[in-house]
UniProtKB/Swiss-Prot annotation:
One of its GO terms (biological process) is regulation of DNA repair. HAMAP family: RecX. This is Regulatory protein RecX. It is found in: Cytoplasm. NCBIfam families: PRK14135.1 (NF010733). Pfam families: RecX_HTH1, RecX_HTH2, RecX_HTH3. Keywords: Cytoplasm. One of its GO terms (cellular component) is cytoplasm. The keyword Cytoplasm applies. Modulates RecA activity. Belongs to the RecX family. It comes from Geobacillus kaustophilus (strain HTA426).
Length: 269
């Protein structure tokens, strides 16, 4: 048992107060509490305070501090409950305090995993052109329950997936380097896979997108062949042709086009 000997605002924060408790047979105790905790327990000078009540006061203040930390964390963008819990845990809050804070945040709609998941899917498909598989993995990492992930991804229609994947394909086509049609398609396939699009969507987009014209393929082959020629020109002709075929075939060019180029440049030094 003890008695509150003094209550005074702290210099650093006007919303926090020093409380000095004189305890029977023990050193005086000094602690700070939030003004809301002060009002919640109706603390005042001269009030007798038991050890049990003191523990409740300290716990309530821990919850209040963690709640304020959570609000600051949420001020930047929407967060999942898992993100908030991880942030508070990193700040040193015990699980019991985190549970209390999340309960309060849910009641006040500051956290809502259903709304968070739906907004996350909308944002990632529109601003980052991500496919559903990548979005799913990110939501799982953010701790969103499977049921809510399924529910939010149900709004990511197949038509939307196709449209976004086609847009990425067309962008890659405009930036196409001097490469074979096969190499180009494989590069785009890998890009779409990294973006999280399912195989059936990728296959459909690549099938619909078309490839190089024959002239474009020849031009790309010519560029790559000139590069390979500079590497292998010092070899005797049989070895030179073997290495040229191997290098250009690895680049995805057809053997008939490679042989045609070699015939046309048979007299090159």
């Amino acid at each position: 048992m003890g008695t509150i000997a003094d209550i005074a605002a702290t210099e650093q924060n006007a919303e926090r107060f020093w409380i000095v408790v004189h305890r029977d047979g023990a050193p005086s105790l000094r602690l700070t509490v939030d003004q809301d905790v002060l009002l919640q327990f109706r603390l005042k000078k001269g009030m007798e305070i038991s050890d049990d009540l003191l523990q409740h006061i300290v716990y309530a203040d821990e919850v209040k501090k963690a709640y304020q930390q959570a609000l600051y964390f949420l001020a930047h963008r929407m967060r999942s409950e898992h993100e908030v819990a991880a942030h508070l845990r990193k700040k040193g809050a015990p699980d019991s305090v985190i549970d209390e804070v999340l309960k309060k945040l849910r009641a006040e709609r500051y956290v809502d995993d259903e709304a968070f998941a739906a907004a996350y899917v909308r944002t990632q498909k529109k601003t980052a052109a991500k496919g559903p598989l990548l979005v799913r993995a990110e939501l799982e990492r953010l701790g969103v329950p499977d049921r809510l992930i399924e529910q939010s991804l149900a709004e990511y229609t197949l038509d939307e997936q196709m449209a976004i994947a086609r847009s990425l394909y067309e962008k890659a086509k405009k930036q196409r380097r001097d490469e074979s049609a096969r190499a180009f398609l494989e590069r785009v396939r890998q890009q779409l896979m990294r973006k999280g699009f399912p195989h059936e969507v990728i296959a459909a987009v690549l099938a619909d997108g078309g490839t190089h014209t024959e002239q474009e393929e020849r031009e790309a082959l010519s560029v790559q062949a000139e590069k390979a020629h500079r590497r292998y020109a010092h070899h005797p002709r049989p070895l030179y042709e073997q290495k040229m075929r191997q290098a250009l075939y690895r680049k995805g060019f057809a053997l008939d086009l490679i042989n045609e180029w070699l015939r046309m440049h048979g007299n090159d030094e």
